[in-house]
Amino acid sequence: MSAVLGYESAREAERVWVDGPGSHRVSCAYKEELLAALHDLKPRRGARLVLFGADVGELAEAERAALMRRMGFVPANGGLMSSLNAWENISLPLAYHAPEKLPAALREVRALLEELGGVGDELLGKLPEHMTLYERRLAAYIRALLEGPDLLVMESLAAGLGPTKRARAARFAEVYQARRPGGTFVHFDA
């Protein structure tokens, strides 16, 4: 049971198994079921979720919480708080979980914005309702990346984006791997 991410659906013989570090595109008939199980680390009755080699159903709550801290998740729509601008959405988790990283974070965020979006500082002041789909995903991706997860799951990497933005989004996996060489990047695009 060495899978970084594994899921067996209760409904059919649907199985998702990601065995090692690197970038993985996953196709899954029960994507929503799997994403829900990842979100709260509680697989549906009869299903099985494996993270970092551990069967989540057999873990105590404290052990599940420890696994959750090793994961980053980016919803298809970005999952940003509507009343916070991009910088506030990006920096809020750091303020709670790693306040010592905040002083250097703005420099790092600016470099990532330039590298991945070519958008510069103007994105940082935007509210989600004024962002494009790509900008929302970019902000959410950067937010997750700054926390340094061992497993980064993107619900959708390129769906709904035009060719230029799809090409930029395709670099998310490359940038993640450069920062977390032993980490695993998973997305669910077809």
Question: Model regions: which residues?
Answer:
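Conserved ABC transporter NBD signature motif
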Residues: 44-57
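Catalytic "switch" loops of ABC-type ATPases
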Residues: 41, 70, 74-81
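Q-loop/switch helix immediately C-terminal to the Walker
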Residues: 77, 83-99, 104, 108
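ABC ATPase NBD coupling module
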Residues: 56-72
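ABC ATPase C-loop
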Residues: 144-145
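Hydrophobic anchor residue at the start of the ABC signature
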Residues: 140-141
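Glycine-rich P-loop/Walker A and Walker A-like loops and their local beta1-loop-alpha1 context
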Residues: 4-43
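Conserved ABC nucleotide-binding domain
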Residues: 112-129
